């Protein structure tokens, strides 16, 4: 009679080859597997991660916080799954969502080493960006990449992101302050949400 009812949004997008959905508590082991398998591959592109990133127990508390962000609409953390949702092949995070007169957020993403070069991130981000623009009514999505990360720059350009600037010592990546190219995608036919 008195059951728990979650108000975490249920977002599950499908593409030709993927399921792109918000991560939840039951994904702890999948996320741990993804980060453990790709730890060395992702290291040059990400902030320093502690060991808990590679263990389900480390993801339990993190996912509780992520679910709160989902409820508040302040961030949306997507897992990129194979069609059977057995394995996470990548992640796409829309964070620091601001409404009001800005309606903007930041995009971060990564894909597992064995899945690179197949167009899967383009496929996933096309669906996730469409969701953020049409359902979350985001006008501006900002994404930044290190100048030597040609793959990321090419992906963002293909998605329609435009270069807006260059920031020195912008983010602490792999223990070093790194320069980044600043890009953004705006929604030309933006409409406010209800």
Swiss-Prot record:
Overexpression suppresses the cold-sensitive phenotype associated with the ribosomal protein uS5 G28D mutation (rpsE). One of its GO terms (cellular component) is cytosol. GO terms for biological process: maturation of SSU-rRNA; protein modification process; ribosome biogenesis. One of its GO terms (molecular function) is N-acetyltransferase activity. It comes from the Bacteria. The lineage of its organism: Bacteria, Pseudomonadati, Pseudomonadota, Gammaproteobacteria, Enterobacterales. InterPro entries: Acyl_CoA_acyltransferase, GNAT_dom, N-acetyltransferase. It catalyses: N-terminal L-alanyl-[ribosomal protein uS5] + acetyl-CoA = N-terminal N(alpha)-acetyl-L-alanyl-[ribosomal protein uS5] + CoA + H(+). The gene is rimJ. Associates with pre-30S subunits. It comes from Escherichia coli (strain K12). Its main location: cytoplasm. It is found in: Cytoplasm. Residues 18-188 form the N-acetyltransferase domain. Belongs to the acetyltransferase family. RimJ subfamily. PANTHER family: [RIBOSOMAL PROTEIN US5]-ALANINE N-ACETYLTRANSFERASE (PTHR43792:SF8), GNAT FAMILY, PUTATIVE (AFU_ORTHOLOGUE AFUA_3G00765)-RELATED-RELATED (PTHR43792). Pfam families: Acetyltransf_3 (PF13302). This is [Ribosomal protein uS5]-alanine N-acetyltransferase. Acetylates the N-terminal alanine of ribosomal protein uS5. Also plays a role in maturation of the 30S ribosomal subunit. Plays a role in the temperature regulation of pap pilin transcription.
């Amino acid at each position: 009679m008195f059951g728990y009812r979650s108000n975490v949004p249920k977002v599950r997008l499908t593409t030709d080859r993927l399921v792109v959905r918000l991560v939840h508590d039951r994904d702890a082991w999948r996320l741990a597997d993804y980060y453990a398998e790709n730890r060395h591959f992702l290291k040059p592109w990400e902030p320093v991660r502690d060991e808990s990133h590679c263990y389900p127990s480390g993801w339990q508390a993190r996912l509780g916080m992520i679910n709160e962000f989902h409820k508040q609409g302040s961030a949306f953390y997507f897992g990129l799954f194979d069609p059977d949702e057995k394995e996470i092949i990548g992640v796409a995070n829309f964070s620091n969502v601001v409404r009001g007169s800005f309606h903007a957020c930041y995009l971060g993403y990564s894909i597992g080493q064995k899945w690179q070069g197949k167009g899967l991130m383009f496929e996933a981000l096309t669906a996730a960006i469409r969701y953020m623009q049409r359902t979350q009514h985001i006008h501006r999505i900002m994404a930044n990449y290190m100048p030597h990360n040609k793959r990321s720059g090419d992906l963002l350009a293909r998605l329609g992101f435009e270069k807006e600037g260059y920031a020195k010592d912008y983010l602490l990546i792999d223990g070093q302050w790194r320069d980044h190219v600043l890009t953004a995608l705006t929604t030309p036919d933006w409409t406010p949400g209800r």
